Amino acid sequence: MMPSPSDSSRSLTSRPSTRGLTHLRLHRPWLQALLTLGLVQVLLGILVVTFSMVASSVTTTESIKRSCPSWAGFSLAFSGVVGIVSWKRPFTLVISFFSLLSVLCVMLSMAGSVLSCKNAQLARDFQQCSLEGKVCVCCPSVPLLRPCPESGQELKVAPNSTCDEARGALKNLLFSVCGLTICAAIICTLSAIVCCIQIFSLDLVHTLAPERSVSGPLGPLGCTSPPPAPLLHTMLDLEEFVPPVPPPPYYPPEYTCSSETDAQSITYNGSMDSPVPLYPTDCPPSYEAVMGLRGDSQATLFDPQLHDGSCICERVASIVDVSMDSGSLVLSAIGDLPGGSSPSEDSCLLELQGSVRSVDYVLFRSIQRSRAGYCLSLDCGLRGPFEESPLPRRPPRAARSYSCSAPEAPPPLGAPTAARSCHRLEGWPPWVGPCFPELRRRVPRGGGRPAAAPPTRAPTRRFSDSSGSLTPPGHRPPHPASPPPLLLPRSHSDPGITTSSDTADFRDLYTKVLEEEAASVSSADTGLCSEACLFRLARCPSPKLLRARSAEKRRPVPTFQKVPLPSGPAPAHSLGDLKGSWPGRGLVTRFLQISRKAPDPSGTGAHGHKQVPRSLWGRPGRESLHLRSCGDLSSSSSLRRLLSGRRLERGTRPHSLSLNGGSRETGL
C-alpha cells in the first residue's frame, strides 16, 4: 500500500523522517481531524466576518458597530488556514502554531460572542419603533422615567420597508454572529486539544516505543539513516555494562644498527633499513660474535713474545685515555688527489702516531652505537673528539699508490708511519693524522713538554715517481734508555684497556701487520687490493694506560724521547716499480699474503729485518689491534670485506715481513 503525500515526519525536531511516515498509518484519523477543524475554522471565520460587517452596516448606533466581532472572524479564518497546512505538512512546528492560534481564537470568539449576544438582546427588547426622518428609532417597551431619546437607550436602524422589519433583521444578524462566535470558540478549543494530543502522543510513542521503517516509492529507498535509540531503551540499557574498547597494542620501535648501514647512513645522510633489529634492552653481542674471532684472541693487548732486545722504538710522549662517553665518530676526509681523481671504494687509511690505541674497543663501540652517523672514522690531535681546533693550513696533497705491496724504507720515528691500503694511499700531515676518537691523547701537565713533537711533513710525490720516505731525512731524535717491562692484558668482558700495575711500563715492542682480506678483480676494483698496514713501534718506556669512564679523568706521565730507526735502502712504492725494476715477484706475494706460521727464532735477514712471530692465540695481532678505516663507504662491499672477511679466511698464510725491504721471500 502506497502512502499518501501527507505521510511525513511529525517529530519535535521538525524534520521529515522515516519515523513520521511510520506513524502516519496509525494516526491518519488525527490528520483528518486536523483538516476538518481547519476547514471549519475557516468557514466560521468567514461567516463571523460577514455577519458582523452586515450588522454594522444596518444600524447607526455606535455601540453596536463597535461590538460587532469582525476581528474574531479574521483570526478564526487565519487559524483554519494554518490547520489545513498542518494536515498537508504535519510538522511539529506547524501543528504547534495551529494549536496556539486555536487557543487565541477561543478567547476572541468568546469575547465576540458575548458582545454580539448582548446587542442581539437589545434589538429584541427595543420593540417600540418610530420613523424619524430616514432613521427608525426604537425604544424599549417598558416605560422609562425619561423619554427614550433623552435616556440614550435608543436603537437607530436604517429603514427598509417598515421599521419593524429593519429591527428584526438587525436582531437576527446579531444573534447569528453570537452563535457563530460560540461555535468558533468550540471549534478552536477542539483544534487546540487535538493538536496537543497529537504532538505529545507522537513524541511519547517515539520516545517509549521502537520504530518501524516504512519504505515505498515516495520514501528514500536505501538512504534511510538508523534512528536514534529510544529513551525507554536507553534507560533500560543503563544497567548493562559495556566495557570500553581496549587501546591498540603497543609495539616498541625497532632500533636497527649494523656497520654497513651506519656507513651508508654517513655517506648518504639517511637511515637504512637493517634486517637485524637491536632493542635498547637487549645485551650487546660479544666481540667475538661481531668480529668472528675466537675466544683466545683477546688474551693480551701486547704479547711479551713480540719483544725483541735488538729492536728500538720511539718514546711515547702522550697519554692514552679510554673515554667511555666520548663523542661520535666522524669520518675523516681524504685529501684532494692530483689529477681530479678520488680514492677507490676499498681505499683504507690508518696511521699510528706514537700512541697506543685500543682498536678493538673502538671497533666494538663504533659498531654498537645506533645510527649516530659514525662508522669507522678517525679524529686525532691534542684534543678530544668534541673539541674543535682550526687546522693551521690545508694538508698537502696526499701521496698515493696503486698497490700496497711495496716495502718502504723506515722513516724517522719523528714522522708518523703511513698505512698502505687498497689502490691508493694517503699520507697525512701529523696535525691531521687519523686516530681513534675513543682514545684521547693529551700532553702531560707536570712533566714538561714532550721531547719529540710531531714534525711537519712536506708534500710528497707519487710513490711511482720517488722511492723516498714520506718524511724528510735527517730528522733523528735522540736514543732512549731501555724501558721497564709492562704487560697490558685484554679482557673478554670489557673491550677497554686496563693496566696490570701502576708501576709497570712497556716491556715489549710490537710489529703488527694487517693483511689483505680478499683480492677482488672487477671493473670497479682493478688491481690488487692489499690492506696490509705496517705499524712500527720499538721498545720504549710507555705511558700509563688508564681505564676511565669519562673524558675528564687524566693522569700526567713523564716525557719520553724518541729513538730513530736506521734507515735502509729506499724501496719502490708502487706495483709498477716492483714489476719494472725489481727482480722477482716474491716481494709482492710476501706483502699480500703474510705467513701465520711462527718465524725462525734465529732471525736471519738483512739489517733491520724483523720477523713477526705468531701470536699466542694463533691469530695475527691485526685483528685485535688494528682497525681499517674505510675511506670510501659508498659501497657495501668494502665494509662487508672488512667486517666479515676474517671469518671466511681461515687458511694458513705466510707471516714473514721485512721492515727494510730485505730479500727474504715466502710462498703463498
From Swiss-Prot:
The modification Phosphoserine is found at residues 358, 389, 493, 574. GO terms for cellular component: membrane. It is found in: Membrane. The chain crosses the membrane at residues 34-54, 67-87, 91-111, 174-194. Residues 398-407 have a biased composition (Low complexity). Widely expressed. InterPro entries: CD20-like, ENTREP1-3. Pfam families: CD20 (PF04103). GO terms for molecular function: WW domain binding. Belongs to the ENTREP family. This is Protein ENTREP3. It comes from Homo sapiens. The gene is ENTREP3.
